[in-house]
């Protein structure tokens, strides 16, 4: 796997993409979705946002609740099977077809900006 994407201006990236750390407060099944997803409520300190996240292959709901995630919070709202997803929880392919969520090495305050 090579990295084939063109370079972008780093300052522009940091201006345009707002990533924040939040704590998962709830993770519910989402049987209405076409893919295996959870309905998450993520606490960003000043507000709670909801997200449709494809983390079902790697995490039980109990594992997610209380964990910190990194999410993109300025993509607008996307409706998934009638559910309004207000942020994108970031993740990485685990090499076995699952997704692991991105987090911080140490706990940080909810709402902390990621650079």
Features from the language model and the residues they span:
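Phosphate-backbone binding interfaces of nucleic-acid-interacting proteins
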Residues: 1-115
């Amino acid at each position: 796997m090579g990295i084939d994407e063109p370079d972008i201006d780093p300052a522009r990236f940091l201006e345009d993409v707002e990533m924040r750390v939040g704590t998962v407060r709830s993770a519910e099944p989402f049987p209405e979705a076409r893919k295996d997803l959870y309905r998450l409520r993520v606490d960003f300190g000043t507000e709670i946002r909801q997200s449709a996240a494809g983390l079902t292959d790697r995490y039980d709901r109990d594992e997610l609740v209380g964990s910190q995630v990194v999410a993109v919070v300025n993509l607008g709202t996307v409706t998934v099977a009638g559910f309004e997803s207000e942020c994108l929880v970031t993740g990485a392919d685990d090499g076995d077809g699952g997704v692991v969520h991105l987090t911080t090495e140490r706990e940080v305050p909810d709402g902390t900006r990621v650079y």
